[in-house]
Amino acid sequence: MASSSSAALRPFGTARLTPGRQTGRQTQQQISAPEPMIAIALSDMEYLMRSARSSRSSGRSERQPGCTCCCHIAAGVTVIPRVARFSIEGGLSTHTLMNHSDNRIAVKITCSDNNMYRVTPVYATVEPGQSLPLHIARITSDLIKRDRLCVNILEADGNKEAREIFKKNANTRAPASINMALEATNDNQNHHHQE
């Protein structure tokens, strides 16, 4: 009996169940024994892979004693959604930057094409546990290309404003960054807020 909706079908792949790393002291029987296979939805497999990667890098969000880099900051900051899609008619896309870290952060937004896109705010500070709305506007243009928006992040010391923090650290500390894709299509449908 065939399903009337193909949207309910999910692609499947296979995954090997492995108990962990094997040592060089295995018997020949252990080496030649096949590992069991299970069927798993590809979306579930992608989720598992993302979870495994994030758990391996979760230690980056905590600064080690003597650390002067800013890579730990980016691990505590997320931007949702990570892609802004526009038609050639332009429009507005709203995103949320969330600070999950324990530190106050300064943010500076840069774009690969400042003539095509306007971003608000350009500079901002975000307190720990708070979020910031990012508004990205694209002008009407027949030019179809992929651009990039970069969220530059520095730890904010004291009560200084973001512009002052970035100016002070211009030659001493490189900011952490999160890149976002800005995509324009010839499709007249509204693509805003999709990932």
From Swiss-Prot:
PROSITE patterns: MSP (PS50202). It holds the Pfam family Motile_Sperm. Residues 20-30 have a biased composition (Low complexity). Residues 1-35 are annotated as: Disordered. SUPFAM superfamilies: PapD-like (SSF49354). Residues 76-184 form the MSP domain. This is Uncharacterized protein D2007.2. It comes from Caenorhabditis elegans.
